[in-house]
Amino acid sequence: TTKYEHVIPQLVAVQEDPAIEGLLVLLNTVGGDVEAGLALAELIASISKPSAAVVLGGGHSIGIPLAVSAQRSFIVPTATMTVHPVRHSGMILGVPQTMRWFEQMQERITGFVASHSGISEKRYTELMMRTGELVMDVGTVLDGRKAVREKLIDELGGLSDALAWLYREIEGK
């Protein structure tokens, strides 16, 4: 599914349940619903308990804000993340207001990613608007090492690395 709303009550439960000491988010997504994904990312970012995210296979499109929403992000070397402009399937009105809506949505995503990772808005936009890498499209595909090098993701690592970080954070509280 590309809908994520069913996860919202589960995240609220993580925050509210005193028996839960931390949050681990495992990501393997091609992306999907931009509004729902950004809402989830904002919710994860606002959880006061230690949180870590691991990109395992794909962290494409709206998966990027989800990956960087945790306090610490990890990515396995073979995972990929596709940075591209907001897209829409189906019919749209070809009017200036529609273009402005797309621009505003992209600004929201870019701002969120830049404020929750080490990448600048300028660099993220450069990667998003790059031509020549994707066939008949704009954007950039980053593997795990490149995502860390671009400061989009905090560190290269998998499940055990994320769990070790979470346990250290929980013990430190």
Feature annotation, model-predicted:
Residues T1-V54, G58-I64, V68-H84, H88-K173:
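N-terminal organellar transit peptides
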